[in-house]
């Protein structure tokens, strides 16, 4: 009975996960932003499942704190202080009580730090990534006839890196279509009708440039789907 309930709970979490990513992808494509609390219900559901069914107390506690810290990322100093403290305390607690989750926690921590400056990812992207990693803890990746267990989070991160390359080339292509320039930015001087949602305009050395705003949550969705297929069919993408 407990196993059946666990399987049902896992299915519900995955349905909410993919539904949330679909909503986020649509919003990101249309507005290049997502609701700041979009991934909160998924995190709450995953927290309940991971604590009540899988007894993962340490990583659940610190992952939740790490996720909540993202709501204060606008205050760089406060965010850096609280996040760094959470990461260190989490490393100690998880190493002692749930060492099998060390890789997953390390990846969550790394992505949470990448939000500083928003150079690679926006806050919404990081919330999506952290919620994907936390809500899929119960999906281990079995290799070598079940003798090796690789966390879903590790394979997801590899796939995320691959789709990030695809996202970069998509950005090149979109910018090239508008400006005829190959690269991450193009001069905006002779370009008319620039969509401010799709393209970001900025100044550099007294010149005006544009950059394509990549709707990255859809690529996070792609990475999640690819990894999930790999888990179900045991194919190490």
Residue ranges and their predicted role:
Residues 1-237:
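A membrane-topology feature that recognizes alpha-helical transmembrane segments
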